[in-house]
Amino acid sequence: MPRRLYVQCRLFNVNDRLATINLCDRIDRWIDMGLLVGMEHTFLPIRDDPVNVANELEIFNNDIAAINECSGLTGFFDGATYDSGCSFEIGYAYTLGYPINLVTTDFFKWTPSGSSNFFYCSQLLNTVATLAAVPDMNPSISDYRQKNLEQLERVFSILQNNLVFDFGTIKPLKPRIEALPIEYDYYLDPNFQYTEAGRYLQNQIVDAIKAANKTFVYGNNMGLILTDIENLRKSGRGIFYSDVFEPDLDSGILQGIAYGIGRKPYTYASNSKQYLEGADWYGYLNCMITYSAETIVTSINELTGLIQS
């Protein structure tokens, strides 16, 4: 198997694409310098995937195959929601035992609910990945360009050190994360809990599970993250909440883990907003979320029927 870094990329605007291409060029230079031992040049899907891809299912399959052929994952990760497909790729790569090294330049930190602990992006992301973070906010417009360039250089220096730690010598990957014997029929996405609409839906789902004499466990991304991942691994099926244009990054990561352990989830998505990419119509969910789910559930009645069956 080649030693190679899969570089995730938010595709939807020029700035993100250019930033990722520049990141690949920088990492490739580190490889040429011998800092990352035995590594091939980076794999960037938008640059290296096969051409003439016919549809989103092919994109999904190509990216899963590419991740399987790599040995680590890296990329920019700025923003609280970011891109759900990138979140999925992190969760899936985590199940393969890959080192995951990400860059964030946000000065925001986030906490779920009333917790006093704040994290870059999320506590879950900080558990499954190593983040290179320089959260400066320059309050002055004077010399703003130079200050931002200096911030990038500092964050790249941290990333380089993190990558050298993981790939400066040849070492085996961590064991793959597998499913565990089933103790719960369903695992409920913790992100149901953070809005009134989500809590209302979760109560209806819990009622349906109890009515079907089945069992469940609440997801919890506020406490012991590894325990929460273990509960997902002990569940027959996850039920995830993707009812916004860009689902919370934790939902994407957890769905990647569920897919990686071979238990494809139900993904709740009643949002009817759609979009065009070029001349092609798509639904509003990222293809990595769509095709890693057992089914996309569009109403609580449909979900209740699945639980009862």
Predicted regions and their residues:
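Conserved catalytic or regulatory cores that recognize and/or transform ribose-phosphate-containing ligands
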Residues: 1-309
